[in-house]
Amino acid sequence: MLELQNITKHYGTKLALDHVSLTLKNGIYGLLGPNGAGKSTLMNIITGNLKPTSGRVLWDGKNVFDCGAAYRSLLGYAPQQQGLYDTFTGIRFLSYMATLKGIPKKEQKGEIWRVLDYVNLTEKAYRPIGTYSGGMKQRILVAQAILGDPHLVVLDEPTAGLDPKERVRIRENIRNISGDKIILVSTHVVSDIESIAKEIILLREGKIVDHDTVPSLCRKHGDVQNLEQVYLQVFGEEEIHDGSHTI
């Protein structure tokens, strides 16, 4: 179980997160909000890459910032398309990441081919990442995030900039990861999270304004029909994406 207790984050005088509290158990969660809401800051704190100004992040009751490598071994993280080694082949990139994650050498080959198969990239394994399409790059990031079968998977904008066909593939990959894992997906593409998330977390100006299932959110916010309408109720005419255009 992942718990966030009164997380606050300041960048100088700018308040990025304001007393955020959250409890996540197994399942897929969507972190939804407009640009500048604090989504990336929150995810960086959850992954241990950024310390909060105040508050605690607990994994099974233990402060993650005291756990070091033990917490990182439980975590899989896929940032937006950055940090990729374009001259590396897909298999070399995953081999490198498997070593960083501490996966024993004798287990790496089987694990790498498992995740490549999972994201349908076995045929592209020996191609340089620089030749991959945007969707392939996102899928190789998802693959490295699930290396070693982590208990917590954090995906930052996994469908950003992709065409509809690739977005569907990524959604299916994410849906199939679930089970005995906590999966947190940050996005501002409403349609990409509505169909797969157990619960939606709505974030605005560093605060959680609601957290519930999609049907419950629809009932609470004007008895509307879908998550896009909830978004409009909560955030007004701020930036909203349905996957093909901005409203």
Write out the residue ranges for each language-model feature.
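Helix-to-loop junction immediately C-terminal to a conserved catalytic motif
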Residues: 47
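Conserved ABC transporter NBD signature motif
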Residues: 55-66, 70-71
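Conserved ABC ATPase "signature" region
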Residues: 95, 99, 106-124
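Catalytic Walker B motif of ABC-type/P-loop ATPase nucleotide-binding domains
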Residues: 153-157
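ABC ATPase "signature
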Residues: 211-212
